[in-house]
C-alpha cells in the first residue's frame, strides 16, 4: 500500500541506531504505531525531533499498513502547534507523564476514533490551561480517560461515610467481606470528589499537594487492577515534585 497522510499523537522517542530513532505514536488511522525518524545533525532531522516531543499532535506521511516493520515518518507538520506546552516546564512534565502512561495503556491498541478525539481535545486543553487547572490536569485526564476505556467507577453509588471498593469500582455502605481492596471513608470521600472532575471544571478543585498525589496514586492503582499495570512509570516521581 502506498504511503498516505496519517494523524498522530507522539508518545515516546527511543534511539535505535546512530542514524535512526523509533517514534511510538497513537494514530487515528492505525492505533499504536512505530515509525522511524532520522537521527542526523541536519536541520531536517532536528526539526523532526522537535516536532515529536511528548504529546505533539501531527499530521505526517507514512505507510502504516505496508510490509515494512517500521516505516519511515515523512513530512511531519504540527496540527496544531502546542505553544503553551512548549513554553511551560510544568506542562512539559505533565506531557511526559501522560505520554508515558499512554504508551503503556495503548501499546496494543487498535484504531479508535473516539479515543483519538478525546486525547487531542485533552492535549489542547492542557496547552491552554493555567493556574490550578494545570495542577489538576493529571487527575482530570486520568478520570475521564477511565470513561473512554470503559472502567469509570459508578459515582452514583457514593453516600457520605461509604467506602470505595477498588475491585468493583463502586462505593459501598459497608466494607466488602471477600477482599481488602477498598479505601477508608476519608479517602473514599476524596475519590468521590475526584469523580466529579472534568476538563471544564478542573480549575475549581482546591486539592492540597498531599491530596493530589494520594489521589493520583489511587487512580494509577485502580488502572493497574482493571486495565494494565502502571506501577513503574518513570516520570511519576518527577511529576510529584511539580504538582
Regions found by a protein language model. Give the residues of each.
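Non-catalytic alpha-helical scaffolds and adjoining flexible linkers that form interface surfaces
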Residues: 1-22, 26-243
Amino acid at each position: 500500500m502506498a504511503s498516505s497522510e496519517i494523524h498522530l499523537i507522539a508518545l515516546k522517542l527511543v534511539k535505535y541506531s546512530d542514524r535512526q530513532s523509533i517514534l511510538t505514536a497513537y494514530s487515528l488511522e492505525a492505533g499504536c504505531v512505530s515509525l522511524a525518524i532520522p537521527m542526523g545533525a541536519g536541520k531536517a532531522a532536528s526539526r523532526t525531533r522537535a516536532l515529536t516531543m511528548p504529546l505533539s499532535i501531527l499530521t505526517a506521511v507514512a505507510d502504516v499498513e505496508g510490509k515494512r516493520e517500521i516505516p519511515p515518518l515523512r513530512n511531519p507538520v504540527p496540527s496544531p502547534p502546542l505553544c503553551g506546552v512548549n513554553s511551560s516546564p510544568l506542562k512539559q512534565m505533565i506531557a511526559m507523564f501522560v505520554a508515558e502512561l499512554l504508551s503503556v495503556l495503548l501499546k496494543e491498541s487498535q484504531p479508535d476514533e473516539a479515543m483519538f478525539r478525546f486525547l487531542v481535545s485533552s492535549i489542547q486543553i492542557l496547552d491552554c490551561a493555567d493556574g490550578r487547572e494545570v495542577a489538576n490536569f493529571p487527575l482530570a485526564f486520568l478520570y475521564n480517560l477511565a470513561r473512554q476505556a470503559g472502567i469509570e467507577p459508578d459515582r452514583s453509588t457514593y453516600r457520605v461515610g461509604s467506602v470505595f471498593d477498588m475491585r468493583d469500582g463502586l462505593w459501598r455502605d459497608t466494607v466488602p467481606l471477600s477482599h481488602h481492596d477498598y479505601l477508608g471513608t476519608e479517602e473514599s470521600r476524596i475519590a468521590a470528589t475526584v469523580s466529579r472532575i472534568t476538563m471544564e471544571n478542573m480549575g475549581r478543585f482546591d486539592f492540597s499537594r498531599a491530596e493530589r498525589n494520594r489521589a493520583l496514586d489511587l487512580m494509577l492503582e485502580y488502572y493497574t487492577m482493571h486495565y494494565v499495570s502502571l506501577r513503574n512509570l518513570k516520570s511519576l516521581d518527577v511529576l510529584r515534585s511539580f504538582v
